[in-house]
Amino acid sequence: MLIGIDVGGTYTDGVLFKQGAIVATVKKPTDDMNLKNTLLEVLDELLPSAGEQKIERIVFSTTLVTNLLATGRGERTALIMLPGHGLPHDAYDICPDIFFARGTVDFRGNVIEKLDQKEIDDILARIAAAGIKRVAVAAKFANRNDIMEREIQSKLAADYPDISVSISSEISNKLNFPRRAATTYFTAMTVKEWMRFAAEINQAITERGLDSEVHILKADGGTFSLDTSSRRPCETVFSGPAASTMGGLALSQPNLNSVVLDIGGTTSDIALIIGGEPLYASKGARLGKHYTHINAFAVNSVALGGDSCLDYDGGIKVQNFRRGAAACFGGDYPTVMDAFNCKMALGIGNAGQSAEKLQQLAAKAGMESSELCRQVVNIVIERLISSIEAMFREWENEPAYKVWEVVNRRKFKLDQIIGIGAAATAIVPQVAARMEVDSFLHDYSPVANALGAAVVRPTLAVELHVDTPNNFFSVGPGGIRGSLNDRGGMQLGEAKNMARQYLLDMCREQGMESYASESSFYMEEQFNIISGWSRSGKIFDVGIQIAPGFISEYKGVSS
Amino acid sequence: MKPTGILFFPAFDWAISPTHPEREERLLYTRDQIFEEGIMDLPQIKEYHPRLAEIRDVARLHFCIPTVEAQIIEAHLVSAGSALVMADAFMQGEVKNAFAIIRPPGHHAMTVSHGNRGFCNINNEAIMIEYLRQKYGIKRVAIVDTDVHHGDGTQEIYWHDPDVLFISFHQDGRTLYPGSGFMEELGGPLAHGTTINLPLAPKTTDAGILYAIDELILPMLEDFKPDIVINSAGQDNHYSDPLANMAFSARGYAELNSRLAPDIAVLEGGYSVETALPYVNMGLIMAMAGIDYSNLREPDYNPSRFKESPRNMEYIKKMVAQQWTAYKNREETIADNRKKSGNFVNYNKSIFYDTEYIYEDQINHLRICQNCGGFRMIESRAHQRTGEHFHVFCISIPANACQQCQEEGRAAYQDMIKKRPFDLLYLQDRVKDDLRIYKVHKDIETVL
């Protein structure tokens, strides 16, 4: 048996899933101040339905990190940046306790300017004097040479053993220094609280006598184990939309181009699935005003949902807030849901209430009730479609760096719209009809998020950079560095083998080796390096991943 | 404030040959640098996706012999198309200025193209300018070519166009390819003084070039009042460039760009792929986006290493004064030329294509018009790289041509169809945007 729990901003959904069917569902309001309690309440309500059967796996998404970042309740953390020469320092407005130090490495990993020991000593002394117990360090091009980050790390360990440190080269091997610095900082400032939370969850699971695997959902639509999560807690942000998207994918046909439209109370989340694969945000998850190296789905949120209330002020307005439930569910004001209910004669809830409240607003606007519904339905459909199409354009207009990519210019051809959330049944078929594609709705659509959490598999992406003339390679995440055995004639195939081997090692270490055989390469680049007029070697960049997908036990839902 | 548009197209799958300076690796470290800096994430920058230019966009400017398709591959269309994307973004008000960091380059490509010269097949900036004129009705254009090599292709294309001010500073042609761009090259009889060349001595530094910008180029732009300013942003004046001998720095380039404030910049040459390009491109992006670049420098930069010599400064000052006079007197000179010339001015020209070892012979005929810059006819012959020989006749009616030049140009085309002494006839009527090729032996006319 599998349990999936999606902790959302308003509600927490949980499902108990067995052999293609949902055995039990639970929905509870989320208590932001005590996520652990909410989680455990949902878990405890699901457990009796399992009876004596073993729970193999529990996966949950959580808003813990999102809340920590939004409220600034993370641990006070100093960020030491080595930005070298380039943008002015005020471009790196990441946190209050920020320190800039000298020390420069270039894109080939050559040291241009060494660390200034005295300057670093001064900075560390100031950090210690301020009572700060956690430090993040980020150097430009540390992904190509981490020597300066390591030096600062060693210095801290020797001089200030009570201060913990995170270095950017261990967080990510990707280019983009500001994103790497922000990701390292956010990791450092949330890790303490996260570990406390993880320990509590572990304890609670043990107390209940369960020996299930416990996984956390990540922004990239995959999971990692509770143990692994404490290395990179930031990856748990935005796991709610990831749960919905993966849930939509789990319920529908794979290999299609789909829009997943998750219609909530006052917001709708739009995600794209291209040939069965969810689309990622090209610049990584955005936390506050900072882009990061956290892999996250591209999700477009529209301030519009089933409970969005309707008003008249010279024209019909669909507001971006709610004044309570829809009239058909006992609310006092007409909502988007009520308008669809009447227009399409859906008979949801108390349809008479929908009609009555809409009639009151129509009278105020001096129009027929049917005209009011027509206008509201139009506004909603048009707003959703324009947001969906904006996402298509954005995807089509991603920068391209090869002739091949421009000549074979991509165009998004939509096959279906997958509806998720309680209000989806009313709205999604209308949007799909207007776009002349199929709509896909499933009985499990309202709990697709929790289902998604229950059945997704772990993910892992490994990036390898090799510079043969410099006899150097680096692997991320984890900040592995080394020199090559045979630098002379290395070819792309060998670099790919090397990347695959590191992926395999990491899979073993994280207890996910059963998925290693499903890895695929998502980046293969090689460049000849010319010195003078002859070739001196090659640079390779290889990326290999276990992409988002489903655990082998999951064979679809019985309809 | 509107953002700066950037189109970064490194063509990671295109090279002239594996070890050629124009190889896949050329913008690799530039990519590393600008990605690592994260500058593309800033709200001051908007990044764009390339597109393919259309065959017509190329044929509006060039006579590609025998056809556009025969002279180029897709990489060229992407590079030229990228410049057009930037032109659209600028003209439609999406960005305050735009920088196309693209390859293959273009500024050595001339009106007639039999092959590749100076790493260039088609002229990206000029294709963009004719597109701007056609689509947006732009009339007056200024091009400032800051590549270390003389922009001889762009100069030839606009030699007779009084509405295009072409200014090129470069390392003296006696010491560097393509061996042209001397002070006396001031434009054709009806466009005299709108081509301005500043041949600089090897080792000229930031100070020397910035003096020319402040004292000559900026006043000229102020006076000429172009509708748009284009920068052919070559980066090989840099002190580390392996193909040239100048002493310009990344910060100097940023400063130059900031003072020049071009509407659209287009990358040209620059072959110090590791020690200059990453920093010069950063500097240019920062300058265009109005980001403080005082913290930018190359790893080995030492400001005291390059001091302008008083002697060279004197030379530059003299040159600036002389070119200013030539520019100021241009209207008188042109009026004088109109009086003393007949109906047509005819001249011969030999063009060498260094990349492909092609020798082209041209006879040019310019109509001396009382109202406009005149239309031009070019008779061209060459053995192309394939061994094939072409003898062609091309008629180009410029975008700002008067009624009479349009009529006479079109009549000349019809006349040539009757006379038939060539393999191919070309009509390029940029006013009507009517582009035709006539295959004489087969009697087939293709309207593009």
Located regions from the model:
Chain A
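N-terminally biased helix-coil "hinge/interface" segments that flank
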Residues: 1-559
